[in-house]
Amino acid sequence: MTIKEIAMKKAEMFKAENGDSYLIAVSDTRNTVAIHEIPVDVFPTLDIFTMTEKEKTVKLSIRAIKDWKKIIESFPKVATFDRKVIDNALEKGQTEKGKSKVNYGHALEHILFNTSFTEILASQSEVDGIYNGKKVQVKASLVTWNKTTGKNNSASIATVCEMNKALFE
C-alpha cells in the first residue's frame, strides 16, 4: 500500500458520509491561526503526507514543514482566529476532559461548531460539522504553540487517519 492509496481510502470514507472538504488550520502569524479549505477530491492528491506502519495499522500524517504549509496555504483561507481564542478553548476542554484527551483539533471544533467537548470526544463520524454549508473534517494539530517561550513547538504533526492494514488486502 502506498501513501496515495491510504489518502484515497480516507477520502472515500469521508465522502461516504457526504463529506465535502477538509479544514486545515495552520499558524498564520505569531498571534493568529488561519483555516484553509481543501476539497475532499483534491486532498488525497496533495504531496503533503507521511506514512508510519505498525504491525496491524498504518497511519497517515501531515507535518508542519515549510513546503507543505505553502501547499496548504495555496487553498482558500476561510477563517482566521486569534491564537488566544483557540488556546482558551483548548484549556477549557483539557480542564473538563483531561489534558491527554483534548487537542487543538477538538478546541477548533468546539469554536467552529459550538459542540461540547463531550460530544466531540464521543463522535465516531468522519464529518466533524457543517461550515459554510459544507460537511467538513477539521485538522488543527499543525498550530501547536509553546505559550511560555512564545515560539512554535517545532514541526508539529496532524494525524489524518490510522487504519487497519486489512482494509487494503
List PLM regions with ranges.
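Nucleic-acid endonuclease domains
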Residues: 1-169
